[in-house]
Amino acid sequence: MEKPPALKKTSTPTSRSSKAHAKDKPASTMKFRTLVFDFDGTIADTLGETRKIFNELAPDYGIRRVDEHEVEKLRHLSLKQLLDHLEIPKRRVPSLIARGTSILRGSITRLDLIQGMSEVLTELRVHVESFGILTSNTPENVDLFLRGHGLREIFDFISSTSKLTGKSKHLKAIRKTFSLRAEEMLYVGDELRDVKASQKAGIPIAAVTWGFNSRESLAAEKPDFIFDQPKDFMRLLKPH
């Protein structure tokens, strides 16, 4: 069984300068002390490359390839429905993720940020005490990507779980590390499993609709926020 990481509070030069810069800004109405983001599909536009890698590995695992014409259909499926549709046995998932993320490392620095996220992340960082990432990708891939886009130093931590359903325990561990009440932390993700993990952990969730799962499927799970474009994050800075 995978255990949540023993996170350490960290401070970076950018984090300190961000907090100092906050003194020159109007008082923030942000109610969250910590923001935690999913990576693939939320911050990084990795979905096309992920599909390419998945299709390369599919013959080795005896599973279905994902054709371009069915991508939109897959956006409406839950994790269980997706695994069933692609004929992926749950026991093969950890190996598939490990091999896939290893291959992804070779192209991660060439991939794009979600358009508009750089400015939004930089602005949000000013208004919170801590900023992090919780992902099923590897910390090494995330680190390389963020450094390539000049954003690594605004993040205090990168947490990773190789289990597709393991994020709930990690969210609880992050909350404990930073001594937060549940309502003081927000997780941001693009998948149904992100919404469900946050709800299981009792932590507010913002679902973004530009990633893997569709707006319709995300809305059905009743997240606390739904954002259709990065600038919608600015709603967090307005009085509630």
Feature-to-residue mapping (PLM):
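N-terminal helical cap/lid subdomain that shapes the substrate entry/recognition surface
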Residues: 30-118, 125
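Conserved H-loop
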Residues: 64, 89, 151-156, 181, ...
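A short, structured active-site edge motif that brings together acidic residues
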Residues: 70-71, 152-165
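Short, acidic loop-to-helix structural element flanking the phosphoryl-transfer center
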Residues: 106-133, 139-143, 168-169
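Surface-exposed amphipathic alpha-helices with a cationic face
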Residues: 118-126, 175, 195-199
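Acidic, Mg2+-coordinating phosphoryl-transfer loop and its flanking beta/alpha structural elements
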Residues: 187-228
